[in-house]
Amino acid sequence: MRRLLLLRHAKAEPGGPDQDDHDRVLAERGLTDADAMARYLKAQGYQPDRILCSTSMRTRQTVAPVLREVPAPIEFVEALYHAPPGRIAALAQDADNDIKVLLMVGHNPGLEQCAALLAREPVKPKELHRHDLLEEKFPTGALAVLEFDITSWKKLSPCSGKLVDFVRPRDL
């Protein structure tokens, strides 16, 4: 089994006219939400074996409390910056086989589209509720957790994952 955690960066300050989008920082609410999501990861036992994080400032700030709560080796990946869903899935497929739990910290719309691409159709009411929330919106700071009955990340494919959790900062 493999578990993929998709965490969208927390709420960021709007960029100024002379500010590069890559350099935007978290808003006060974003800092609070990032802390809450990090505590949630720990409380749920979502201990990643590896973290892949976009190189943007807001994703770096989002992952900082995560590293305190659930420390793991991290790689900052330029290709995750505003990555489309196919690129996100491809990065997961490239993960080493010894990694059972992979956390990716990035941006929308790519993360939301990737979660929707990989999640199978819900079969139970609880799954249906999670899917409905995911389809409604993948807000800043939200986390989607997908489980795959595969032995290698290379076998990751569309509609093959079970959406076992979807949580937004406001849910905590």
Where are these regions (language model features)?
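Glycine-rich phosphate-binding loop signature in dinucleotide/nucleotide-binding domains
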Residues: Q44-Y46, D94-K100
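Domain-level recognition of soluble alpha/beta enzyme cores
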Residues: A119-V164, P169
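A short beta-strand-loop-alpha-helix capping motif that often carries His-Thr
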Residues: V105-G110, C114, L146
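Active-site-proximal alpha-helix that buttresses catalytic centers in soluble enzyme cores
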Residues: R2-R87, L111, L117-P125, F138
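Conserved histidine-centered catalytic loops in small-molecule metabolism enzymes
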Residues: D49-L67, I74, E147-L172
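Beta-strand elements within well-structured catalytic alpha/beta cores of enzymes
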Residues: R3-L7, K100-G106
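A structure-centric signal for secondary-structure junctions around beta-strands
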Residues: M1-R2, I99, T140, S160
